Amino acid sequence: MDFSIKGCDWSKGEAKGFLTGKSDCIVLGIFEAQTLSGAALDIDTATKGLISRVVKAGDMDGKRGKTLFLHEVSGIGASRVLLVGLGKQDAFNQKAYNDAATTAWRALLATKVVQVTFSLAQLPVDERSSDWGVRAAILALRNETYRFTQMKSKPEPASHTLKRVVFSVDPADEKAAKVAIKQAVALANGMDLTRDLGNLPGNVCTPIYLGNTAKKIAKDWGLKAEVLGLKQIQALKMGSFLSVARASVEPPQFIVLHYQGAAAKAAPVVLVGKGITFDTGGISLKPGEGMDEMKYDMCGAGSVLGTMRAVAEMGLKINVVAIVPTCENMPGGNATKPGDIVTSMKGLTIEVLNTDAEGRLILCDALTYAERFKPAAVIDVATLTGACVIALGGHNSGLFSTNDALAGELLDASREANDPAWRMPLDDEYQDQLKSNFADLANIGGRPAGAVTAACFLSRFTESYPWAHLDIAGTAWKGGAAKGATGRPVPLLAQFLIDRAGQ
């Protein structure tokens, strides 16, 4: 798909090139119960009031989700005009813009258009500039065109014919919009990788597969990859991580991926991703219904690897280290049992009261390992708790942090990236739920505040650096008819790193 930019100030009569240029379709936004403005007004003038007549006749009322194609329109070079309802102008926010862009792409992809002129990026959205609109629109398009067909013997070819999109932007935003295209394509490629890894079955996407994926990213983009095997993990005394991996025939891997975009002495941001490639729950076995979705329990790892690919493609001026502890959580004769006590890399002993609370057991050793990089910040990403799904559903990722400044940066990035997160409490009082009579701490704290106590557990291993935890159990994948990985929170993480890099 080819994307390009053309600056245009509709208010100064600079639209001639758009009006006469050859295109299969021009996309226009129509607000509900508002007079025409911007691109819609200029094209209405060029077509001698056609848009106004269509609106007046009630064929396009501007309500959100409405679309109308106009064919063989005289006065312009495009063979079609697509009108997209935007809803009420005073309620037109980032979500409404994304909905409008998605609606437009769905309508266009169902036709045989090849080249499209897209004017929606210039709409007023929460004081965002049109370069923001370009990036959001490209991500919406790539989301609509994503298909996972790797495991089908005869995959159906793409049904759409769209190949080129020209975005009209405010002239002052033209340079930034070109950067936005590069960022959006890199983000989409990273999200596609994350989704592919999540959607692959557990018998394909094994710990070794994730390790090989990291090596491929390193080879393709000039990164440095280290993949530690069982003996090396044992030498590091990662007893907590190994307690989860011990019953699986798939050997555990500990992946470390280095991206250097800044001076070698600059402290890196460390991303840690939970990589349970299949989670049965272990001896604390999960119910059979829906267990197939536990292939998605490595989406934290997938999102970290996808983010690293995106960062490398964007060429961000920042140092980033990705750490992925990865294994399966299986039952077996040598599996960890409820009540067993294991020793973490940090030296803390952990009473494993529930083997299905395994994500925190592999993450805690990775968080300890992260200390050696003297990081500027550490962010772990995990499909950690069903309790977070109960609390926040599938819209917001749960954000926990012991550092207010870091939490603020991540929340700002989530809003900019349209990848919502909600900060959750992490009060010291919750730590009491992790007390054990027999070890330094237990791996669960009971049913109350389950997402919070899971984060509290992780916080015990993060005292030496600014730390945040993203619980993506509700946002990493969707179930039902639309089952599949979402690619989140790659946009949030990438935006955070873009902001940190000052780009």
Swiss-Prot record:
GO molecular function, one term: metalloaminopeptidase activity
Cellular component annotations (GO), alphabetically ordered: cytoplasm
Coiled coil: none
Domain of life assignment: Bacteria
Sequence positions that bind Mn(2+) 1: D279, D356, E358
EC number(s) recorded for this UniProt protein: 3.4.11.1, 3.4.11.10
UniProt keyword list: Aminopeptidase, Cytoplasm, Hydrolase, Manganese, Metal-binding, Protease
Keyword Phosphoprotein found: no
Binding, Mn(2+) 2: K274, D279, D297, E358
Enzyme class label: hydrolase
UniProt-annotated catalytic positions: K286, R360
Catalytic activity annotation: Release of an N-terminal amino acid, Xaa-|-Yaa-, in which Xaa is preferably Leu, but may be other amino acids including Pro although not Arg or Lys, and Yaa may be Pro. Amino acid amides and methyl esters are also readily hydrolyzed, but rates on arylamides are exceedingly low; Release of an N-terminal amino acid, preferentially leucine, but not glutamic or aspartic acids
Principal cellular location given in the protein's record: cytoplasm
InterPro entries named among the record's database cross-references: Leucine_aapep/pepB, Macro_dom-like, Peptidase_M17_C, Peptidase_M17_leu_NH2_pept, Peptidase_M17_N
Entry's localization field: Cytoplasm
Entry note: cofactor: Binds 2 manganese ions per subunit.
The family this protein is said to belong to: Belongs to the peptidase M17 family.
PANTHER family the UniProt entry points to: CYTOSOL AMINOPEPTIDASE (PTHR11963:SF23), LEUCINE AMINOPEPTIDASE-RELATED (PTHR11963)
NCBIfam families linked: PRK00913.1-2 (NF002073), PRK00913.1-4 (NF002074), PRK00913.2-4 (NF002077), PRK00913.3-5 (NF002083)
UniProt function note: Presumably involved in the processing and regular turnover of intracellular proteins. Catalyzes the removal of unsubstituted N-terminal amino acids from various peptides.
Name under which the protein is recorded: Probable cytosol aminopeptidase
Annotated gene: pepA
